[in-house]
Each structure stands twice: as structure tokens, then as C-alpha cells.
Design a protein with these regions (language model features):
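Alpha-helical assembly-interface signal, strongest on the long, hydrophobic N-terminal helix that forms
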Residues: 2-82
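Short, conserved structural patches
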Residues: 2-12, 76-142
Length: 142
């Protein structure tokens, strides 16, 4: 004789089997959805690091160039040369591709600007970097 307990037990066994069967392949679908998101986050993090490194190199080169241009016998050309030398020593095109330096010197201030782009790990996305530094011109006082 079939009792209510045996019906309930067989029903739970059947639904347990079918529920487990419906979960088959779910980890593959989760990976298809999650892996591109994880890679995107990873590449954005690397892109941010490359941008800030290029920005740091640009400001350091601009400061170096401004110090050279602001020295007592310095010229704007000396500042541009010092900034260019700094960028090439820091990695050149591997750090700041398309680096361009401009400089000016007045009676009181020397300014050097370094512009370029950061390296890109995301295709079609290049970030411009522009940093400027100004220093007072050294002069002899008596």
C-alpha cells in the first residue's frame, strides 16, 4: 500500500534530481559573464597605473627643465634639453610616447611644459598628459 510518507519521499527524490540537473552548466555561464568583467577591471587598473606613471615622469621632467632654465646662466633651450634628457632617461617612448617640450624664460620666471600621451592597454584609448613647472630665475643680489 502506498502511503503519504512514501509519496512524499519519492516526490522529494525526483525533484532533487531534476533540480540538480537544471544547475548543470551554470558555472560555465557564470564564467562567460564574469571573466570579461574581471578582465575589464584589471585592464582599467593597469591603464590607470600607466597614466599616473606617465604623468609623474612628465611633471618631473618639467621640474628638471624649469630648474635648468631658471639657473643664473640658463636659457629656455637649456630647460627644453634637460626635460628631453630626463624623459629619455626615464624610458622615453616606452613611458611617454610623443613627448613634446616647450619652454620660456622671462626676467623673473622660467617655465617648461611637457606634453605627450600615456601608453595604452585598451585599444583606441590614449590619454593626453600635460604638465608644467615654473621657477623663479636666479639672479645675483648684492
Amino acid at each position: 500500500m502506498v502511503t503519504m510518507t512514501t509519496l512524499r519521499a519519492s516526490c522529494c527524490r525526483l525533484t532533487g534530481r531534476t533540480a540538480a540537473g537544471r544547475e548543470r552548466g551554470s558555472s560555465s555561464i557564470q564564467m562567460v559573464i564574469l571573466m570579461p568583467a574581471l578582465f575589464s577591471i584589471m585592464f582599467l587598473g593597469m591603464q590607470g597605473a600607466l597614466y599616473y606613471h606617465a604623468r609623474t615622469v612628465a611633471i618631473a621632467a618639467a621640474q628638471e627643465g624649469a630648474r635648468a632654465a631658471g639657473s643664473q646662466n640658463g636659457t629656455a633651450g637649456d630647460g627644453i634639453s634637460a626635460a628631453s634628457s630626463f624623459v629619455s632617461d626615464a624610458g622615453g617612448k616606452d613611458v611617454l610616447p610623443g613627448a613634446h617640450m616647450t619652454g620660456s624664460r622671462s626676467a623673473t620666471t622660467a617655465t617648461v611644459t611637457v606634453t605627450g600621451t600615456s601608453l595604452s592597454v585598451i585599444p583606441g584609448w590614449s590619454l593626453a598628459v600635460s604638465q608644467s613647472a615654473s621657477v623663479p630665475v636666479e639672479r645675483i643680489t648684492r
